[in-house]
Amino acid sequence: MAKDVRFDTDARNRMLKGVNTLADAVKVTLGPKGRNVVIDKSFGAPRITKDGVSVAKEIELEDKFENMGAQMVKEVASRTNDEAGDGTTTATVLAQAIIKEGLKSVAAGMNPMDLKRGIDLAVTKVIAEIQGSAREVADSDEVAQVGTISANGEAEIGRQIADAMQKVGNDGVITVEENKGLETETDVVEGMQFDRGYLSPYFVTNPDKMIAELDDCLILLHEKKLSSLQPMVPLLETVIQSGKPLLIIAEDVEGEALATLVVNKLRGGLKIAAVKAPGFGDRRKAMLQDIAILTGGQVIAEDLGMKLESVTMDMLGTAKRLTISKDETTIVDGAGNKPEIEARVAQIRQQIEESTSDYDREKLQERVAKLAGGVAVIKVGGMSEIEVKERKDRVDDALNATRAAVQEGIVVGGGVALVQGGKSLAGLEGENADQNAGIAIVRRALEAPLRQIAENSGVDGSVVAGKIRESDDNAFGFNAQTEEYGDLFKFGVIDPAKVVRTALQDAASVAGLLITTEAMVADKPAKEGAPAGGGMPDMGGMGGMM
């Protein structure tokens, strides 16, 4: 296919037009008084959102060169979202500001490579300043404040997330789902839960709720299928004498083995239940080992030369309470050794760092949470499906922001951390005038998010930026929600340092690539009216065959 090639100023101007189209659509959502964007869907109701990355993902431009610019900025939003989970609009605004200023300098005859080096120097310095000024999250009130800011000022969302984090710990899994009702509520599952239920409804001990509840329970972990209970008879007799209930977790319990367990349960001789082991393949082995460490038992594995005939009581795990429904099993208060559990968590964390697959990383993260804390589910409610989806976007953002705050600490919000970081560039010098111009570009661009937040609140951004530049107090800023100046930490206007850092890094990285672009290549659009495949343009002679 023939290609269309553009060079120099023409290429950069087309690209800048695409950047501006996307960034202008995204930046209206920034800040507590940011506006909504309505996105048309090919089926169903349109989607209403204030989530920057959701807006960016929907934008495709007709002109191929403009579209390339838009896609590059879309990449900024996506990368920031993947790494920090929030700050996508800030990243987009920063990228637009750096690209605009950078392309002006290139048009004025400056060397693009030196400009990029100057930009990189400035960004490194500002990031060091942001990380240096970050402070740890002190209490759940600050967690709630971070969540509230990220959820566009909705305090209830911030509170729900703070409650969930308090209950399951910083390592616990928090998932967000849509609720059928109007209320937004948080359910917490303590202990380890996995998605396998009882193998027979005859194991149920609470017929009203159709669940099996076993207190002070022994747990047998077997790696293979159980088809016959003959090898286990000595163990089962010992369990009956102990008077404790028994849960069997195996790859499967089938045929005669399951029938024997059910008959013994119904006769009242044995308090017992059986469930399949969670996961598949190697992940199943790993999860069985997790359960073993959590409950202080051993996995009966033929690879290790262990046979069911030789299993003794001290090889069984124990837990204070077990709840088994038809779909899931929850183990609460396992008798595992704390240092061993911590060592296992550290081992899985190491695997998370080394993993290259997002899916594997997510599954490993779930395993850490199940061992370390628990699982909380935030169920988002609303008056309509559109409202629920819009709120769910904001809850997701807020959740990611609070996690980021716990990891790297918090800084003043409202775009002020970037402006304060920019003050550290006062004495920074590059190797030549063009590098100094790159440093100046970053210094000016750092004010863009603050200006945009003010503009979206109906206030003059230049006036706000000027006041904050003049102040020596690093926490002094503009609260766009109440339109007053003061200590942003006291106002509860705070941002996670990780989100601010990631937004700036990703914006500068992509902006640097665009500034140093000299040529662009795209497919030429097909001429209108050309036959699609060349053959059989006229089917008129086949009319008589109808």
From Swiss-Prot:
Sequence similarity: Belongs to the chaperonin (HSP60) family.
**GO molecular function terms here?**
ATP binding; ATP-dependent protein folding chaperone; isomerase activity; unfolded protein binding
What top-level class of enzyme does the UniProt entry assign?
isomerase
Q: What is this protein's function per UniProt? A: Together with its co-chaperonin GroES, plays an essential role in assisting protein folding. The GroEL-GroES system forms a nano-cage that allows encapsulation of the non-native substrate proteins and provides a physical environment optimized to promote and accelerate protein folding.
User: Which keywords belong to this entry?
Assistant: ATP-binding, Chaperone, Cytoplasm, Isomerase, Nucleotide-binding
Q: What EC number(s) are associated with this protein in UniProt?
A: 5.6.1.7
Gene symbol here is groEL
* A Gene Ontology cellular-component term: cytoplasm
Q: Where is the composition biased (Gly residues)?
A: 531-546
For this protein, the record's PROSITE patterns field holds: CHAPERONINS_CPN60 (PS00296)
Pfam families hit by this protein: Cpn60_TCP1
Region annotation (Disordered) ranges: 526-546
Look up keyword Mitochondrion and say if it applies. no
- Entry's PANTHER family? 60 KDA HEAT SHOCK PROTEIN, MITOCHONDRIAL
Q: From the Swiss-Prot or TrEMBL record, give the protein name.
A: Chaperonin GroEL
What positions does the entry give for ATP binding?
29-32, 50, 86-90, 414, 495
Chief location of this protein within or outside the cell = cytoplasm
| InterPro entries, per the entry | Chaperonin_Cpn60_CS, Cpn60/GroEL, Cpn60/GroEL/TCP-1, GroEL-like_apical_dom_sf, GROEL-like_equatorial_sf, TCP-1-like_intermed_sf
Q: Where in the cell is it found?
A: Cytoplasm
Which reaction is catalysed here? ATP + H2O + a folded polypeptide = ADP + phosphate + an unfolded polypeptide
Instruction: Describe its assembly.
Output: Forms a cylinder of 14 subunits composed of two heptameric rings stacked back-to-back. Interacts with the co-chaperonin GroES.
